[in-house]
Amino acid sequence: MSWQAYVDEHLMCEIEGHHLASAAILGHDGTVWAQSADFPQFKPEEITGIMKDFDEPGHLAPTGMFVATAKYMVIQGEPGAVIRGKKGAGGITIKKTGQALVVGIYDEPMTPGQCNMVVERLGDYLVKQGL
């Protein structure tokens, strides 16, 4: 299966009538492997900050997490594995695998739990595949 198929079929899938606003699979260096049409472009320093938070959980909490200049308040996650952010009525979930970052961005009416489920399910699958 291509990386684009993972995005199209597993991240942008319908969940209780709703979809993520955008999604992508990136390398740890920020290189886009596949993305949805409306996925924002990360700046290199944003990827650096995200990767540092995976290595040093809590690094982003004081400043927030920036994605294409949009600021997300960092909320509960799983240290070293998942970063979650909230911005207004939407948010973001980032799951780190051995080689990739699986990213989902949502807006209402999709819930944070639905976004977490979609992103983390694919991320867990990729981890089991050694990716």
Curated annotation (Swiss-Prot):
Pfam families: Profilin. The modification Phosphothreonine is found at residue 111. Disulfide bonds join 13-115. InterPro entries: PFN, PFN_euk, PFN_sf, Profilin_CS. It is found in: Cytoplasm, Cytoskeleton. It comes from the Eukaryota. Keywords: Actin-binding, Allergen, Cytoplasm, Cytoskeleton, Disulfide bond, Phosphoprotein. GO terms for molecular function: actin monomer binding. Phosphorylated by MAP kinases. One of its GO terms (cellular component) is cytoskeleton. Its main location: cytoplasm. CDD domains: PROF (cd00148). Binds to actin and affects the structure of the cytoskeleton. At high concentrations, profilin prevents the polymerization of actin, whereas it enhances it at low concentrations. Belongs to the profilin family. This is Profilin-8. It comes from Olea europaea. The lineage of its organism: Eukaryota, Viridiplantae, Streptophyta, Embryophyta, Tracheophyta.
